[in-house]
């Protein structure tokens, strides 16, 4: 029995079946499944009545994958169910004037997007042709869908900002430098810890003779395994910068600030060490030692993306867009009295106050591109968020989007968090490109979902 049906613009019929599952069993068994299967698991390890709740989401064996690099946008059917789904989506993508077919077969559709041929006004830049053009076409196809969870789930790389803030790139890029990596799942498991309920939402897609009904889920290709799963790491940690080299770049950035080129730039270093255990163990360790609003484990077959973040990037529901800039950090004390002293010191820190003010000013400016005048509001100022080892001071900002703008506009207009780039943002990311030695890849980007309903949660 179908619990919900929707017909898309071109006639794709989506049927959803809702199945209640045992709440006590939970859905974290999917974490172990992700050692060997494509998919994702996202959870919130903290609860805040205004912003965060203790949800868990997961899916495995998605039928369709989207991977974008600088010069191409690839859709891949990952299992037999993905083949008819890819065939349904192909015509609606190819009819877009800015999308061109590069190559195709039954399981792959490789596209290119035309580069902008004109200048766009500040308020229109999120609409210029880009990697998000095919994603917009998909969102337009399913516009009006009343479903909380169906959409594109995955990761968005730092390099996406160079499509919005176009500038010369000085570092070479490789196949590992993705702009985004997304999945379209067809079975999503959701657990609401507050209401103590759990559901599996299962989707079937049909368009004329094409259908996913009765199709198998076995993946066409497997997941890469660690070469020596039982070998222990020696613990050596390496970096792409020596301490002296990094401090030299920091001194150079200070000089740029002194002469007035920028207010702030956030330079990064990449650290790496060998790890030969299952990725699920790493994710569970991170959940245990650093409970966060955004805990994530993406299995991308040739790489795994695991993390825990305290910061909401952009969230959109209807015309409401919100974000939570973070700046100001203090280490937790050994007891309640020490905690109170450190919170007081954090509140009295002029440096932390002005830095958060700057971050929020940039955030409000980002919103002004797409929001109605007078609707951008500060909902919380220097609120204290408590985590396992740290306190953060956080602002909470919302705005109401103007007619004609959507969640993708909100997402693009905010790329990326000032706390990981700098201000003015365009100048800061140019300096990052010029002086860092490794592309940031996923660092400084975002994870989350773009729902077909128009909701964004990143």
What are these regions (language model features)?
Residues 1-458:
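Extended alpha-helical targeting/anchoring segments
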């Amino acid at each position: 029995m179908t619990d919900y049906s929707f017909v898309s613009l071109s006639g794709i019929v989506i049927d959803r079946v809702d199945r209640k599952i045992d709440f006590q069993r939970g859905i974290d068994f999917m974490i172990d499944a992700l050692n060997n299967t494509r998919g994702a698991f996202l959870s919130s390890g903290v609860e805040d009545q205004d912003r965060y709740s203790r949800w868990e989401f997961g899916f495995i064996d998605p039928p369709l994958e989207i991977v974008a690099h600088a010069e191409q946008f690839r859709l891949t059917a990952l299992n037999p169910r993905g083949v008819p789904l890819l065939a349904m989506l192909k015509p609606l993508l190819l009819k877009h004037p800015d999308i061109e077919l590069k190559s195709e077969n039954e399981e792959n559709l490789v596209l290119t997007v035309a580069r902008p041929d004109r200048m766009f006004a500040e308020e229109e830049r999120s609409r210029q042709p880009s990697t998000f053009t095919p994603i917009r076409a998909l969102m337009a196809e399913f516009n009006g869908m009343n479903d909380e969870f169906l959409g594109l789930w995955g990761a968005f790389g730092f390099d996406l900002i160079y499509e919005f803030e176009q500038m010369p790139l000085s570092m070479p890029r490789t196949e590992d430098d993705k702009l985004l990596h997304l999945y379209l799942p067809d079975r999503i498991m959701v657990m609401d810890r507050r209401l103590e309920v759990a559901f599996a939402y299962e989707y079937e897609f049909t368009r004329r003779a094409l259908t996913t009904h009765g199709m198998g889920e076995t993946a066409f290709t497997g997941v890469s395994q660690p070469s020596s799963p039982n070998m222990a790491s020696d613990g050596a940690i390496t970096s792409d910068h020596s301490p002296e080299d990094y401090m030299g770049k920091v001194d150079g950035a200070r000089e740029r600030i002194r002469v007035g080129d920028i207010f702030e730039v956030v330079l990064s270093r990449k650290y790496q060490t060998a790890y030969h255990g299952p990725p699920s163990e790493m994710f569970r360790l991170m959940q245990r030692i650093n409970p966060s609003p955004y805990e994530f484990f993406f299995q991308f077959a040739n790489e795994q993306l695991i993390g825990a973040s305290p910061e909401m990037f952009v969230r959109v529901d209807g015309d409401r867009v919100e974000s939570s800039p973070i700046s100001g950090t203090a280490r937790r004390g050994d007891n309640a009295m020490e905690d109170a002293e450190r919170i007081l010191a954090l509140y009295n820190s002029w440096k932390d106050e002005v830095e958060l003010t700057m971050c929020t000013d940039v955030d409000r400016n980002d919103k002004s591109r797409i929001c109605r005048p007078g609707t951008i509001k500060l909902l919380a100022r220097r609120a204290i968020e408590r985590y396992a080892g740290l306190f953060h001071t956080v602002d909470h900002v919302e705005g109401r989007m103007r007619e004609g703008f959507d969640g993708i506009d909100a997402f693009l207009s905010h790329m990326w968090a000032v706390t990981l780039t700098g201000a003015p943002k365009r100048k800061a990311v140019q300096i990052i490109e010029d002086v860092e030695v490794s592309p940031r890849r996923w660092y400084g980007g975002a994870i989350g979902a773009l729902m077909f309903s128009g909701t964004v949660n990143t």
